[in-house]
Amino acid sequence: MIALTPRQIADITGGRLVHPEDARVATPVDGTVETDSRLVTPGSIFFALRGEVTDGHLFVEAATSNGAALVVAERELETTAPLVVVDDGVVALSRLAAAVVEHVRRLGRLKVVGVTGSNGKTSTKNMLRAVLGDVAPTVAPQGSFNNHVGAPISMLRIDETTEYLVVEMGASGPGEIARLVDIARPDTGVVLKVGLAHAGGFGGIEGTRAAKAEMVTDLPATGTAVLNADDDRVAGMASVTAARVVTFGQGASADYRASDIDVSASGTSFSFEHGDASRRVSLRILGEHHVMNALAALSVVGEWGVDLDRAVTVLEGVTRAERWRMEVLDAPGGVTVVNDAYNASPDSVAAALKTLAQITGPDHRSVAVLGEMAELGEYARDEHDRVGRLVVRLNVGQLVVVGHEARHIHMAAGLEGSWDGESVLVDTIDEAYDFLQGTLRAGDVVLVKSSKSAGLRLLGDRLAGVTA
C-alpha cells in the first residue's frame, strides 16, 4: 500500500483516533491491509470486521502480537497499536481503497480493469495478471477476492509503482458490482457471461443481467467496455454504456475472435483472429470455456497497446487458474482426477462435463462425481435435473451424485436412460470415496464438481492422494 499515517487514514475513513497524542499517529504505515489476524505481518493494518461466523474484534490482540502497526475497529479496544474507530468497518475499508486508487491514478500511469461475469472471472483475472505482469508492475487478487471486502483489500495492494490493477468483481445481489465500480473506477470493464450463478440472490437471470451490467453503465466515455458477443444478454449491454465497446467471441462480427477449437487432455487450442492477423494459440488450461476467458484477456491487453504476439506467448505458459479449478491430478492406479470443485453453476457444470467427454478417449471411462449447485433459489430443481440429463446425453460412463440437495441430478439421469448402476446417489463424501475406491480402474478420467459449500474439492484431493 502507499504510505499513509494513521492520522491520514482516520481522515480518509471518517474515523476517530483514540489516542491522537500518540507520536505514532504521525508515522507512515505502508504494510498490507488484512482482515484475518493470522495474515498480519509487521507493519500491517488490521481491519476488525464483524462477519457471519466470527468477529474480528476478538482477534485484535492476535493481530498486534503479529506486528499490526494500526488497528481500525468499530469500537474502542485495549490495544498496543494506534487505533482508529469507525462507524462501519466495511465502509471505511472501501473509502480507504478508493482514496489509494485515486492517489496512484493521479500519478498518471495506473490503468484499472474490472472483470465480472457469472463464470470465468478468476481464470480471466489470472490471465490478465500473467500478461500485464510481463509488461509492467501489476496487482491482481490472489484467489477469489472479489466481494465487498476482498476486492478493496486487493486494491489496497497497489503502490506508486503499480501500472496495472486487475479487479475481480463478484456479486450475490443487485448493487454490489456498482459499489465496487465506484471504488475502483475502472478504465476498462469486462463482462464475460450472464448465467444462473447466484440466481437466487438476483431474482432470476434478468436480475443477474442487470447486476452484471453495473460493470459498464458508469464507465466514462473515455473508457472501454469489453463484451462477450456470443452472449446476447452481455452484447446488449452496449446500449447502456457511454464507453467505447469492444467485443470478443466466436462469431465473425467480434473484434477478437476464436475458431477451430480443439480440446485434449493436455490443453485447449484455437485459432485467434484480430483484424487481418491470425495465429494458433495453445493453452495449457483444460476446457473449451477457457477460450472465451483468453479472448477477453487478449481484448483488454490489445486495446491497452500490449503486443498480442507477446500476450499469446505469455498465455501459453499459464497452467491453471487456482486450486480446484479444472485441476488435473494423477491419482494412484492410473486414474486421472479433474478437480473442478471450487464452485459450480449450471453453466460451469455443463462446460466441465463437456470437457470430460472431450478428453476421455474411446478406450477409457469417464466418471462424473457431482454435488449441489448452491444459491439457485427457485431454479434449483430444474437446473439439477438438466445436469442429470446432460450426463446421460454425453455418455458419461459412471455418475456419482453426492448429497441430498443434489439428488435431482441422479433422478434425472435415471429418467434419461441411465441404468444398471450407471448412476448412484450417496449421502456423504465418505460414502462417495468408498464407492469410487471400489470401482475406479486404470485409465478412468474422473471429474469432481460441486459448489464450494458441498465440499467435493476435498474428495477430489483425497482421490488423488493430495494432502495439502
Q: Which residues make up each language-model segment?
A:
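Active-site beta-alpha connecting loops in nucleotide-dependent enzymes
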Residues: V53-T54, E322, Y342-S418
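Short, basic phosphate-binding NTP loop
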Residues: M1-G114, S123-D134, L156, R323, ...
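Phosphate-binding loop of NTP-binding sites
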Residues: A92-A229, A235-T241, G438, R462-A468
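ATP-dependent carboxylate/acyl-activation modules
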Residues: V115, K121, G133, R323-E327, ...
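Residue-level signal for inorganic ion chemistry
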Residues: I9, S44, A63, L96, ...
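Acidic, Mg2+-coordinating active-site environments of NTP-dependent enzymes
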Residues: A10, R16, A73-A81, T188-T336, ...
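Non-catalytic positions within long, well-ordered alpha-helices that form the structural scaffold/packing
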Residues: V60, T64-S65, V181-D182, V392
